[in-house]
């Protein structure tokens, strides 16, 4: 399936630009104070990361290195902390708009559009994460695991606004797929272009804010995009195999 690489590339560039870290911080800001907050934040972070990554391995590595130590610190046994992260990351493969490679193969073999696949996958994906939330809550009650202290939780408003630009390419992708009914390849191609523009503009503005040369910011943004392209190529190897 020729357009799989474009979706892998989109997720890799967005993650390299800081999208993965943004979703983790946003998850902790949203549910970190709840009972068993670290486990629930890990589930939500993996679900949000699943929006941009169809790889359960990449999802686990991206979120797990941060969430598992916090879950263990809160009192959750190491085995259960690992189980929560793996279960949430594996479910990320069925979270639209970017799903696992099997979704693309399914669309081609059945002769249906990728749009049809993701619309039918959305509700089961949401239900699966609700179930994980419920199970983690029961475990937290049983083990008497509290939420994180206020001092360790990032402020919600500030956190959301700090990375709202990461949501723009995802919105464009969903809009082109679901509303305009573009082909998957065309939708993700223009989403990648919009993401690259956002990265370059962000770095130029950041450089000007620090009274540095805009060309330095532009160069940094280009290097960031190149790093994302390299990561996308590496991630595609696992899909191809």
What is each stretch, according to the model?
Residues 26-92, 98, 102:
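Hydrophobic transmembrane alpha-helices that form the pore/transport pathway of multi-pass ion
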Residues 47-48, 90, 105-109, 171-175, ...:
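Alpha-helical transmembrane segments of multipass membrane proteins
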Residues 107-123:
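Helix-coil boundary and interhelical linker segments in multi-pass alpha-helical membrane proteins
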Residues 1-21, 212, 216-241:
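Core transmembrane alpha-helical segments of multi-pass membrane transporters/permeases
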Residues 20-31, 66-70, 111, 142-153:
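Flexible loop linkers connecting adjacent transmembrane helices
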Residues 3-7, 37-38, 42, 46, ...:
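Hydrophobic alpha-helical transmembrane segments in multi-pass membrane proteins
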Residues 119-235:
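Long, contiguous bundles of hydrophobic transmembrane helices that form the permeation core
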């Amino acid at each position: 399936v020729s357009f799989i690489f474009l979706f892998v590339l989109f997720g890799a560039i967005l993650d390299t630009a800081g999208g993965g870290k943004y979703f983790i911080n946003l998850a902790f800001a949203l549910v970190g104070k709840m009972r068993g907050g670290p486990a629930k934040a890990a589930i939500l972070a993996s679900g949000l990361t699943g929006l941009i990554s169809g790889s359960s391995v990449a999802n686990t590595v991206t979120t797990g290195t941060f969430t598992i130590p916090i879950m263990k610190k809160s009192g959750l046994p190491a085995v259960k902390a690992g189980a929560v992260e793996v279960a949430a990351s594996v479910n990320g493969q069925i979270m639209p708009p970017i799903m696992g490679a099997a979704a693309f193969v399914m669309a081609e073999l059945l002769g249906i559009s990728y749009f049809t696949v993701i619309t039918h996958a959305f509700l089961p994906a949401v239900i699966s994460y609700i179930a994980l939330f419920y199970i983690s809550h029961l475990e937290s009650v049983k083990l008497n695991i509290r939420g994180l202290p206020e001092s360790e939780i990032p402020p919600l408003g500030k956190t959301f606004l700090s990375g709202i630009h990461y949501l723009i390419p995802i919105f464009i992708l969903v809009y082109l797929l679901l509303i305009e009914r573009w082909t998957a390849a065309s939708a993700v191609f223009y989403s990648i272009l919009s993401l690259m523009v956002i990265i370059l503009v962000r770095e130029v503005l950041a450089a000007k804010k620090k009274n540095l040369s805009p060309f330095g910011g532009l160069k940094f943004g280009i290097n960031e995009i190149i790093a994302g392209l390299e990561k996308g190529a590496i991630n595609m190897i696992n899909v191809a195999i």
